[in-house]
Amino acid sequence: MKLHILAVGHKMPDWIATGFDEYAKRMPPELRIELREIKPEQRSSGRPAESVMAAERIRIEAALPKNARIVALDERGKDWTTMQLAGALPSWQQDGRDVAFLIGGADGLDPDLKARADMLLRVSSLTLPHAMVRVLLAEQLYRAWTITQNHPYHRV
């Protein structure tokens, strides 16, 4: 099973790539994390956010792996703990489908895309920069995996 992170945005600072890569390389081969950057739609004054999100939705849908479980990151999503994420990983692996985590652009994810998702997940109650979410999600996926392996990275 692969864990795909589809994130709207590009040209991230070097420290974001370094942080993301650090956690991605720690994952075992059977749970590889792959980042796919989705080109953000050009914003202009007077253009409604709905139009921007719809254009980004088309790009995200084109990048989605076939038959993947879709987890859309959204501020109104389920507020899981790390332990809940760790509990989900083994069942997702048994399911056999890849998992695609979706990170929207500046306006968020298109409502049709969120409706299509298997799950809406809240990463934080805080407002975070999109770039930071990539690193945070990769770290939490690594931490969740270490919990399933009784690895000492996670301490309670």
Swiss-Prot record:
- What's the Enzyme Commission number for this chain? 2.1.1.177
Pfam families given for it? Answer: SPOUT_MTase
Known catalysed reaction(s)? Answer: pseudouridine(1915) in 23S rRNA + S-adenosyl-L-methionine = N(3)-methylpseudouridine(1915) in 23S rRNA + S-adenosyl-L-homocysteine + H(+)
Matching InterPro entries: Alpha/beta_knot_MTases, RlmH-like, tRNA_m1G_MTases_N
Q: Which GO terms describe its cellular component?
A: cytoplasm
Q: Name one GO molecular function term.
A: rRNA (pseudouridine-N3-)-methyltransferase activity
Keyword set includes Cytoplasm: yes
Query: Which keywords does this Swiss-Prot/TrEMBL entry list?
Result: Cytoplasm, Methyltransferase, rRNA processing, S-adenosyl-L-methionine, Transferase
| Residues the entry annotates as binding S-adenosyl-L-methionine | 73, 104, 123-128
State the compartments where it is located: Cytoplasm
Tell me where on the tree of life, at the top rank, the source sits. Bacteria
UniProt family annotation: Belongs to the RNA methyltransferase RlmH family.
What is this protein for, i.e. what is its function?
Specifically methylates the pseudouridine at position 1915 (m3Psi1915) in 23S rRNA.
Q: How does it assemble?
A: Homodimer.
In Swiss-Prot or TrEMBL terms, this protein is called: Ribosomal RNA large subunit methyltransferase H
